[in-house]
């Protein structure tokens, strides 16, 4: 029988998503980047979304990520993942990092979830799968299944605007990104910035000024007028 776990504690980690990449490849018998390209990105016309983007885009088409990073010996990192685990252990393709995209393409994925797994008339995910992502909330943290959520009990620590309902799911990214889906109001909010370029160790302003939640707040306030 199953023995219940004791002293359960929450730890934020990338390891589970790195393992998910291995699971996808084991089941699909394909590299994850090729599997996603075949099953999602191409049919959804996500033409600006890719792992290892330098294989299909010009360097000038990709925003530089960082300069003078001590791990890259002062070179400009452009077109390759910034996350150290994905970069040095996963070859640039991982479940936790490495995907390059645009706001429009990212919004398509979140719209797919809001619409129950259907995009542009074609089903990509079952409604049951989407419901798991949209409704599950951890009992020991504010997070959902694979996504972050608003902290409805502490607006100061919440990654979302205070006006965001508890149904919202999404995530922020270290390099200055965030994307949120609001199934209650049928909204998608995507914000892509580049806070660690050119100075990798001077990137606190985005968080200090609370830019991402404040921009999301503007969206909600506009809807309330």
What are the functions of these language-model segments?
Residues 186-194, 199-203:
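Short, well-ordered beta-strand elements
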Residues 115, 119, 128-129, 138-139, ...:
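Short, gly/Ser/Thr-rich active-site loops of penicillin-recognizing serine hydrolases
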Residues 1-167:
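Short, surface-exposed loop or secondary-structure junction motifs
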Residues 160-172, 205-214:
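Glycine-rich, flexible loop segments associated with nucleotide phosphate handling
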Residues 24, 113, 183, 192-195:
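Short beta-strand segments enriched in hydrophobic/aromatic residues
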Residues 168, 175-188:
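Short, surface-exposed beta-strand/loop micro-motifs that present aromatic residues
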Residues 79, 173-176:
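Glycine-centered small-residue hotspots that permit tight backbone geometry or close packing
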């Amino acid at each position: 029988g199953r023995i219940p776990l004791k002293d359960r504690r929450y730890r934020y980690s990338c390891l589970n998503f790195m393992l998910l990449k291995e699971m996808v490849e084991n089941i699909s018998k394909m590299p994850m980047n090729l599997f996603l390209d075949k099953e999602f990105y191409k049919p959804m016309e996500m033409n600006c979304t890719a792992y290892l983007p330098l294989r299909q885009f010009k360097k000038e088409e990709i925003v530089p990520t960082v300069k003078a990073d001590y791990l890259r010996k002062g070179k400009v990192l452009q077109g390759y993942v910034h996350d150290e685990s994905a970069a040095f252990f996963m070859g640039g393709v991982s479940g936790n990092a490495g995907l390059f995209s645009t706001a429009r393409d990212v919004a398509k994925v979140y719209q797919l979830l809001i619409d129950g797994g259907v995009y542009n008339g074609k089903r990509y995910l079952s409604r049951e799968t989407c419901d798991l992502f949209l409704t599950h909330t951890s009992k020991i943290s504010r997070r959902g299944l694979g996504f972050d959520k608003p902290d409805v009990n502490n607006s100061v620590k919440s990654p979302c605007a205070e006006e965001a309902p508890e149904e919202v799911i999404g995530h922020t990214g270290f390099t200055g990104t965030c994307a949120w889906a609001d199934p209650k109001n049928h909204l998608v909010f995507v914000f892509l910035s580049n806070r660690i370029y050119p100075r990798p160790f001077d990137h606190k302003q985005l968080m200090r000024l609370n830019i991402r939640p404040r921009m999301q707040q503007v969206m909600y306030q506009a809807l309330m007028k």
